[in-house]
Amino acid sequence: MKYIDILERKLGRKATKAEIEAFTVMWSEHCGYSHTKGYIRQLPRVGFGGNAGIVPLDDYHFIAFKVESHNHPSAVEPFNGAATGVGGIIRDILAMGARPTAVLDSLHMDKITEGIIDGISDYGNSIGVPTVGGELRISNYYKYNPLVNVMAVGIGKNEHLIPSMAKRAGQVIVIFGGATGRDGIHGASFASEDLTGEKATKLSIQVGDPFAEKMLIEAFLEMVEEGLVEGAQDLGAGGVLSATSELVAKADLGAVVHLERIALREPDMNPVEILISESQERMAVVTSPEKADRVIEIARKHLLFADIAAEVTKTGQYVAKYNGKTVIDVPAKLLEESPEESIYDYTPSEMPKFSWIKFKDIDAHEVFERYDYMVGTDTVVKPGYGPAVMRVKGSCGYSLVIHSRADLGFQDPYWAAYITLLESVRKTLAVGARPLAITDGINYADPDVEPEGLAAQMMGLKNACEFSNVPVASGNASLYNTYKGKGIPPTLVIGMIGKLEDLNVPRPKKGPVYALGFKDFELEREKILWNEIERIAKSGHFVVSMHDFSTMSTLKSELQNVGLEMKLKIPKCEPAHQLVVVFGDVETKLPKELIGYVR
């Protein structure tokens, strides 16, 4: 264990073997964010700190959303790695009291990996949540370290918003869902290391059951509707240990956990294995003792295992027992207070002259066709046509973007992050939506070897958010994406939520095509472009559609998807440009300096 000296100094004694196992999980990079939490505190934030980020949508509803990575598991076992990535992020949304409504994915691979695509489509289609958008980037940089970033979104009623912590001593914690096995043991530690060597084993990969997930979704939402849920956590990385300790540590409380009450799939598991297993489709619910029987009744009605697994105490101690024998007894807050690495003092430079880094041109349409993107009947704009657009029946609409610029990451991580955010804003504005907030997926190689690259990426994100006035609501960090010392490009994935007040803006069916904007990037021009994009997007009577494009291949794909078989002559652009393609009669509606190259 990397931090064992720090642990024993804080405990004031030698740590037991069981405690070392527990803190190895909780203080891993995956759970503890040792290298990134100093940077995360500097970000402009909103609705931050729960299982997922939240922003208000209207007077009655909130949106919960988050991006999560499952990179290491997908490299070792593509199908289960990708599938459980979908399942885990869905439960994060669910734990906020929201019904999951959409999934998007950002995939970076050296070739189309059928197992990853099948894992996402099989899980999402089976649980009835539409996969409404995404991006697919193909490059040899990701040969040994594919990136699988999944974004999930949900809508909840304001009165059903669930906190991610207990409220008082005397409450109980019910764990319900699927049975617990050995799959995923030390998965959090595995996800915090280089993929080289014997640790990259299938034992560390969780195995998903989408039908159990569907039952869990409906059971939990029924509990929420009946007012039974007073706090909730998904059982993801760190399993029972992580979920139950987080619930009490945030409230300066303690817990006594009874491990013999956890339903097992493998009856010979030892107490520590039960404590840290990352078996999927499980949740922890905080409730009052008098409500616990009804919580268990609902779970079992949906064919799920359930029992009171813990009591909330006022001691501040986290005590895990097995048949009355203490397994660990440590301060609950200590489990959550992983050591923090110092942040790197980075000073950005002027934006460089970027060169094109070739990513393979692919038609993502064949991937989208495997996804059920219309289930739920709330998908307004289907995949491949720019940002996804969803409706809330009886209310407004919202847009969903997931975007990255890995092609710029090696050249300058600061400006790559900055430009990724700006382009996400353009994409959101182009469908007539107002950006509300983002969720970030930080994908990086080895921060111990190259700390300046991580610092640059984080500062680029921070400064771009401040420039755009778009806060961060949630996020994820995946580090040590390396194989035999060779790492991926710094790859920031941004998921953006936007709000559409009116989904019924009339549109013409045809019109001329324009390239709008500037072929060279200048930051001071950006808000000029945004203002005009927003204005013409909302003036629907003369605009057929509008698309930001990040690369020429992206433009080509979107032209094909809207049925345009044409050669559009776009001026030769820099890799960082400020161009939007507009289909519609806008020439007389815009300032001359913004109209580019009418064809």
Each model region followed by its residue ranges:
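Glycine/proline-enriched, intrinsically flexible loops and inter-domain linkers
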Residues: 1-599
